[in-house]
Amino acid sequence: MYEYIKGKYIGINKDYIIVDNNGVGYKIFTSGNTMANMPKPEEDVLIYLTQIVRQDFIGLYGFLTKDELEMFNKLLTINGVGAKASLSLLSICTVNNLKYAIITGDEKTIVKAPGIGKKTAQRIILELKDKFKSTDISKGNSEINNLDVDYDEHSKKLEEVRFALNSLGYSEKETDRAINNVDKSEGIENIIKSCLRFLMN
């Protein structure tokens, strides 16, 4: 039903973002990767969408890139892999890294995602391996490994920032909002200082 939405980025919550389009705020569930790359609030953004309709739930899921949306949809075709598990995978892996893990049969990377056990990881590899080629990965193996290291270090850095802010009494929602509004390329100490300045304003 939906292809994409273009509007003003309003903010982030635990597992979704809010985009305003013509005065209507759209709640869009998304991955950690997309959340980490969102612009600053009030800036325009384009999110590629898919809608999931169940008997007890209707929700929008969206991503900054078509590649991530396509990977999300492919994961949903696998028995036992729902939207939550798919988002979990796309939060601990970039699309390139996940494709590489599937092509090479790397279960260890896939089971790092919360909600993904060994059998599910094996099923993902079995059912999707033939759908990807090495040429689908836009970076070489050495760069893939560098991406892994960079992403792991980035995630670890943000976790330390979250822990520090939570220890100071800030809620998860306040912490996520602050992190989303500061420069995350700086060192941990500077990110914490920037977050505190944001929260105190």
Curated annotation (Swiss-Prot):
Region described as Domain III: spans on this chain: 154-201
CC annotations in GO: cytoplasm; Holliday junction helicase complex; Holliday junction resolvase complex
Transmembrane stretches, start-end: none
Annotated localization: Cytoplasm
Domain of life: Bacteria
Annotated stretches, region: Domain I: 1-64
Region feature Flexible linker, mapped onto this chain: 144-154
Region (Domain II): 65-143
Molecular functions per Gene Ontology: ATP binding; four-way junction DNA binding; four-way junction helicase activity
Coiled-coil features, chain-numbered ranges: none
GO biological process: DNA recombination; DNA repair
UniProt KW keywords: Cytoplasm, DNA damage, DNA recombination, DNA repair, DNA-binding
Protein family according to the UniProt entry: Belongs to the RuvA family.
Function: The RuvA-RuvB-RuvC complex processes Holliday junction (HJ) DNA during genetic recombination and DNA repair, while the RuvA-RuvB complex plays an important role in the rescue of blocked DNA replication forks via replication fork reversal (RFR). RuvA specifically binds to HJ cruciform DNA, conferring on it an open structure. The RuvB hexamer acts as an ATP-dependent pump, pulling dsDNA into and through the RuvAB complex. HJ branch migration allows RuvC to scan DNA until it finds its consensus sequence, where it cleaves and resolves the cruciform DNA.
Domain notes: Has three domains with a flexible linker between the domains II and III and assumes an 'L' shape. Domain III is highly mobile and contacts RuvB.
Quaternary structure annotation from Swiss-Prot or TrEMBL: Homotetramer. Forms an RuvA(8)-RuvB(12)-Holliday junction (HJ) complex. HJ DNA is sandwiched between 2 RuvA tetramers; dsDNA enters through RuvA and exits via RuvB. An RuvB hexamer assembles on each DNA strand where it exits the tetramer. Each RuvB hexamer is contacted by two RuvA subunits (via domain III) on 2 adjacent RuvB subunits; this complex drives branch migration. In the full resolvosome a probable DNA-RuvA(4)-RuvB(12)-RuvC(2) complex forms which resolves the HJ.
UniProt-recorded name of the protein: Holliday junction branch migration complex subunit RuvA
Source organism (scientific name): Clostridium acetobutylicum (strain ATCC 824 / DSM 792 / JCM 1419 / IAM 19013 / LMG 5710 / NBRC 13948 / NRRL B-527 / VKM B-1787 / 2291 / W)
Gene: ruvA
